[in-house]
Amino acid sequence: MGERAYHGAQVCSGTNPRKCQDLGDSILLLLGSFILLNVWINVVTLLWKHLKSSLRILFRHFFPKDKQPSGSHPICICSSVDPKNLCSKVSSRVHPRPGFLLRRVNHLDSWIPDTNDEKVSACCCVPPKCGHAGVPRESARGLYKAGMMGGGEAPQVTASKAQASLLSRPETSSQFPKMSKLDTGPCHLPQESKTKTPDCAPAEAPAQAQVHSPTHTPVCTPTHPWTRSTDHTAVHTPAHSWTHSKARTPEGTHSQAQDTSAQAQAHTSAPTPAQTPAHIQAHTPAPTPAKASAHTKAHTSAQAQTHSPPHTPEYTHSQAHSPEHTSAHSPAQAPMPVPAHPQAHAPEYTSAHAPAYIPDHSHLVRSSVPVPTSAPAPPGTLAPATTPVLAPTPAPVPASAPSPAPALVMALTTTPVPDPVPATTPAPIITPIPSTPPAFSHDLSTGHVVYDARREKQNFFHMSSPQNPEYSRKDLATLFRPQEGQDLVSSGISEQTKQCSGDSAKLPAGSILGYLELRNMEWKNSDDAKDKFPQTKTSPYCSFHPCSSEKNTDSQAPFYPKFLAYSRDTACAKTCFHSATTAQSSVCTLPPPFTLSLPLVPPRSFVPPQPTNHQRPSTLIQTPTVLPTSKSPQSILTSQFPIPSLFATISQPLIQPQCPECHESLGLTQDSGLQRTPGPSKDSRVPRNLDLAQNPDLYKNPGLTQDPGLHENPGLAPNQGLHEFPGLPQDSYLCQNPSPSQDFGLHKNSGITQDSHPQKNTGLTQEAGILRSPCLTQSPGLHKKTPFTQTSDLQRSSGFTQDSGIYRNLEPNQETVIYKNQDLSQATDHQKNLGSSKDSGGHKNTGNVQDPGVCSTAGLTEDSGSQKGPYVPQDSEVNKSSGVIQESFLHKSPGLVQTSGLPKCSGLTQNSGDYKNPGLIQDCGGHKVKGLTQDSNLPSLTQATKVERRFSLPQDVGVYRSSEHSQDSNLHKCPGINQDPGPHKDPALVQDSGLPKISGLTQESGPYKSSCLIPDPSLYKNPSPALGSDFVQLLSLLQTPKSTLSLMKSSVPEKAAQKEDAQRHVLWARVQLNENSCPSKAQVVSNDLQTFSEVPVLIELQSSSWRAGSQHGAYRPVDTVPSGYQNYRQMSMPTHINWKSHCPGPGTQAGHVVFDARQRRLAVGKDKCEALSPRRLHQEAPSNSGKPSRSGDIRM
């Protein structure tokens, strides 16, 4: 069998094994071969590469000439003006780019050639070689002179020579190549092309530009090319578009010496008719208007450049530019000088005006200004100017008698005939600016390196008044840098402008706002400029000098939308600096003397097309954005949510940052919530309180009653039901928002952060919103700081801001709500602070006791915990309804402040202390249970409590925390929340105790309120409560008796009232004592709180001063409070004591609720066990006094 099996296996494999093996071997061989092959291939490739490199090196070594052929063709931009770079090599590859640039005339960046300076030879061509440098140039200039003199421009010719030196675009070009990639020349700016026109164009171009004061416009009779004040019509046809833009009449017959360089050379030296024709290819073959339009767009600049050399009638070589692009301006026609194509612009055509010299090099860039696009008749205007020159103009285009060559060069102004221009120029002109670079393109095609516009600018800068460097190079650089392409255009424009400036003739009326002075920009003026433009030091700098005509130009279509014009003239205020990218015309922002008119277009007409990155101005946008951002919170808060005047005033600013969130969610709902239910105002709160009073009565009475009875859970349930139920209407969102955020207020309050969350949750935002709104800052500061982290949970739900603790306390006190409603109604604002605080305290004691004991004390601390657990529903509901309102109210009042204050020390402490302590102590167990529910939430509450405690402790620390938080720390921590809840519960349970304590609490509430009021600003932050505590107690006691009584009465009329009275008396005594110890502070705080009651934000105010000053003083008096009350209100007196102890603490963090519930608890951890005892709080407070958080409490 085995054999069989084996045999079978064999059979299976049978002969197959061999076959398989063979197959496998074959495969392996193949794979191995393949691998080896690959390896060999790689090796060979590598070897070949190395070999190739070696061979190349050897070959080059032996045949250096090969380098040149392989390398870019050397393009000579000869500029007698620019000794540095008479010639520059531009790789042949660059040549096509100019064409591309021409196509993308509008994209300045596209104009910039990629060639590297490396490729630019120092001087490849000898001036004679170019036929422009040296004698030829001189002769050309001489001719030009003659022409000019004939035109009355002989002196200008000399000037043009001088300017050529300064402005010589060739020079600039040659320089620029070194400066930037543009420097490599293929970038043919219309102006640059001509000026730069490879070979001779650069030198010649300057002359041309100078000579070529485009007379296109009748206005601009280009009588003085050098003047460069392109007489361009309103269109401001930059006759000096370096590319001799054929002023293509609609027909488009624009003789354009295409090769700017060649033409320029021709212009500079004897015009080279042959060259011109060749380059003239740029000229539209047919003068058809359509073509003209097309070319116009393409050549807008060119046309502008089209030097309407009417003034040089002598150069009648107008090159009629028969429709067939006769590069008519045969150089011969108008000898070297001024191919100022008058653009004879016969009424119909601007087109033909290719300077004789333009022919070859002048890339009569097709920046053919569509001058005559609409020009037949308008050109007539130009025609007059150009007409004289037009003598020989062929039919299609009036003879474009070339002006002196310089004129041609300067044709950058892409100005169509003034009249035609307005019609067609606007659109095309913008393009023409880019077409200025196209001029380069043409030259590039000829292989001439067109000096970078920036280079040109540099030269021009030299030529132009050096004043421009004064301009904020930064802005200019910013624009230039971002818009290097624009720079090219700018340079072209600048050149044109320069010509204009050089000529000082009227500015072109076209899109050129003024004449640009281009200078080498030494970016030292502006770092930004350097940043923008690495080569800033060499960057051309444009000075745009708006002329009177510029204004006219502004009205016209922008010719240089992409150009940077730096205007020194205030007129440039009209002209706005526009980054092509910036839609906004904000150049005016630049000093009027130096304004960038990037588009060189009137702001109204300017259409920023380009990248925003070019514009520093975009920062303007940013700024607006920032402004909205900074103010949006406030605006939102203010606009979205009605805010009490005080509240809005203070709270808004403070809250706004946070409030927006609150506001957004509850949107000042807290504020709104409070306000919202009743109204955004405190009065609203009062109504709300009233409503709450009803609701609080409802939920307070039921809630309290229930809360007292059901206080913990039942209370919660009832509170929930009641609170929610009655509280729902007004607290509906409050209650609801706070409901989720009920604790949310507190818990959230616990941490505004939490608050944030809970606040976000619901009311938190609401409550927190309110709190935040009013006290958002506070809340954040307080809650956040203190963060009612504990409160956070509860407060978060309920209303962190809600005054987390206070809110909680308040909030927790449905009674507080009632109280609030009552007292708030009574003391709406004041009592809101006070009442809220009081509410927090009294109500807390009362309502809290009921609603919360949890709600109340837990409200803050416990609210965090207690409220959170059972209280979340309960507090959520009750606290929410009432608490939120309360909280809201509280928050609103000093609610937040109170939160700050109360939780800090005052409300809470008072509440906590007296109320809480009694409640706490009592509640410690009961509340704990309750608080535990809450404490269940207590965990989080405990945390919250801790946090809250931190906050609340800090807040309450002195009073509440100390008493309750101290206890609450323990209690809250241990029963911590319980403590809070305890008091709540206790108030519910011990509610009577709590109530008396509530009295105390109320008192404390009052103090809390005071605290809130006072602490609102400071207390809140400082543990305003500490400060507030004394005071709050003081104030609160003062008010508390009313509010507390009312609150107590409304909340827990019987127990609450009794206890409240009792405790209030006690508290009052204590508070008075506190008040005595810090009466002025207390009063001040009280007053402040009252004043700020609506603005919980005051907590922050209180925090620094009160904590430091008030806190110590205010809290010390607390000691005098009877021990019984102290027990109930443990922190009431103990808080005061603690406050004393914490006095150092207040100093610790001024302006914050420094006492950290958690820290306090930590410090008071041992005291937590003592949390029930008032002195625990005292101890705790003292221990924490050093702690910023605790300090706050002490302060309270």
Curated annotation (Swiss-Prot):
Compositionally biased region (Pro residues): 391-402
Superkingdom of this protein's organism: Eukaryota
Signal sequence, start to end: none
Transmembrane segment boundaries: 27-47
Membrane topology per record: Single-pass membrane protein
One of the GO biological process terms: flagellated sperm motility
CC terms in the record's Gene Ontology section: cytoplasm; membrane
Subcellular location: Membrane
Polar residues bias: start-end ranges: 157-177, 299-321, 733-742, 750-762, 787-804, 826-849
Biased composition (Basic and acidic residues): 962-971
Annotated region (Disordered), positions in chain: 150-345, 367-402, 669-762, 775-806, 826-877, 960-1009, 1168-1196
Keywords noted in UniProt: Membrane, Transmembrane, Transmembrane helix
Biased composition (Low complexity): 212-227, 253-279
Primary localisation category: membrane
Xref: PANTHER family: SPEM FAMILY MEMBER 3, SPERMATID MATURATION PROTEIN 1
Protein name in UniProt: Uncharacterized protein SPEM3
Taxonomic placement: Eukaryota, Metazoa, Chordata, Craniata, Vertebrata
